[in-house]
Amino acid sequence: TLANGLRAMDEVIEFLDYGSGDRFGHGLALGLNVDAYFKKKRYTIVSNVEEYFDDIVWMYHFIRAHIDRLEVKDFISGLSYTEYDILSMLEREFDRVKGYYNFDKLYTLYDFYEAYKLRGDDPEVYLEYNDGWNYDKVKFCCQTRINWHNPEHQSAANNPKARELYIKYHYCDKYKANHFKTFTGEASSIFIDAVKLVQFILRLKIYRMEIGIEGNPTSNRKISFINKYIDLPLLELNS
């Protein structure tokens, strides 16, 4: 899905320490016309449960983290829905899709996001050190196995529910089974606005971080649903 492609790019930045001078290949998701994309898909979302759930969790917190920027507020003013409408929709969708997991413990949207922020870590660390958890000790012993230099990492690793969820993500059969369950849903107008918003925020983030986008018109056309060169996503990035 388009949201999944945008999330994957943000994961590269956060988990692989991208910075000024680094480059993305193609980066089609950044420049695609969101309305045209969902029209082509007949306003249908097709994914697996796990990926769609991750998209919802990421979109919610990605928007929350950048909502106070003037450029973002200005962009939202041109959408059909307010930031409150969009965030409320994502909260409802989180509660709905969470039912697929059927956990016997209450995990919040924030717990899932904190677990998501541990994705760059070696999961074995959380099995080895979970009893008597001490972040400074783990950081000292496992510097090459955890993403400790990410400014949001410590709060996530110190959240016991986030650690539990991260262990489940890798080792729980019930959790992993959702990767093989097909999710089909409607791309509503408010969901489309949410995707437009995260696309804009990610473009702004990449621009401010001075990360480059490599593009080749012929290959871009072949790997996307675009038929005309004039509609290439690369051109949208230069607008």
Located regions from the model:
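Histidine/acidic residue-rich metal-binding segments in metalloenzymes
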Residues: 1-23, 33-184, 193-212, 228-238
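Active-site-proximal loop/turn and secondary-structure-junction residues that shape catalytic pockets
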Residues: 2-4, 28-32, 217-221
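Active-site-proximal segments of catalytic enzyme domains
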Residues: 187-191, 195, 218-219
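Glycine/threonine-rich flexible loop motifs
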Residues: 224
